[in-house]
Amino acid sequence: MASVKKLAGKVAIVTGGASGIGEVTARLFAERGARAVVIADMQPEKGGTVAESIGGRRCSYVHCDITDEQQVRSVVDWTAATYGGVDVMFCNAGTASATAQTVLDLDLAQFDRVMRVNARGTAACVKQAARKMVELGRGGAIICTASATVHHAGPNLTDYIMSKCGVLGLVRSASLQLGVHGIRVNSVSPTALATPLTATIGLRTAADVESFYGQVTSLKGVAITAEHVAEAVAFLASDEAAFVTGHDLAVDGGLQCLPFVAVAK
């Protein structure tokens, strides 16, 4: 399929862009014509390799721990100073606990870590991107990675689900508050796919994901990939979504259309 330059001229930041959904989205942003893509991540070797492969003049890696707001602010300010603006912020960095985290066995140390990254860290990213976009006065698009789990009760991963529900609340509130500045705020909610993140909860391959979710999605014969999610993000980042804000775009194969069935891991 020929590349369509729907992001031509835009400057984008992708947190968690060194691997998984973030990496694929960063590459797609560049393919769709983004003038510059900044990969903000904590994996210097992987992030640097991705940036170099996209093209050193139009893609940079910057170390960023999103739980440190000053680091987030620095990335945003550096991007604007280096590339002349910030048009798109994809708040994608996230984490999950390595254990089941049922209510009765909730490890609060892990809980705090997950909330610090997924909820607090995402809030810092939205805040700092919005600050710069308001300062520049030309609007912008902010997209956050939520999760299909926010629409269902879960048999485990309680802390993860709570954190992503927080992301959804952030997106809705931010879209209301920032609309006056021409800033759109949306989210994508994918089901699990084989990424370094889902490997921590036992979903290491596409076959693992298909086995886990295939029973509870209505769309058969298609397994979710990072490319599917990246396409959704690219749409929300583009001017084609100019009148879309406060929306959670499900990339879930129809999971929301069916009663949830707890699948044993």
UniProtKB/Swiss-Prot annotation:
InterPro entries: NAD(P)-bd_dom_sf, SDR_fam. Peltate glandular trichomes. Its main location: mitochondrion. Keywords: Mitochondrion, NAD, NADP, Oxidoreductase, Transit peptide. It holds the Pfam family adh_short_C2. Optimum pH is 10. It is found in: Mitochondrion. It is an enzyme of class 1 (oxidoreductase). Residues 1-30 form a transit peptide. It catalyses: (1S,6R)-isopiperitenol + NAD(+) = (6R)-isopiperitenone + NADH + H(+); (1S,5R)-carveol + NADP(+) = (R)-carvone + NADPH + H(+). Its EC number is 1.1.1.223, 1.1.1.243. Substrate binds at residue 147. NAD(+) binds at residues 13-38. GO terms for cellular component: mitochondrion. GO terms for biological process: menthol biosynthetic process. Belongs to the short-chain dehydrogenases/reductases (SDR) family. This is (-)-isopiperitenol/(-)-carveol dehydrogenase, mitochondrial. It comes from Mentha piperita (Peppermint).
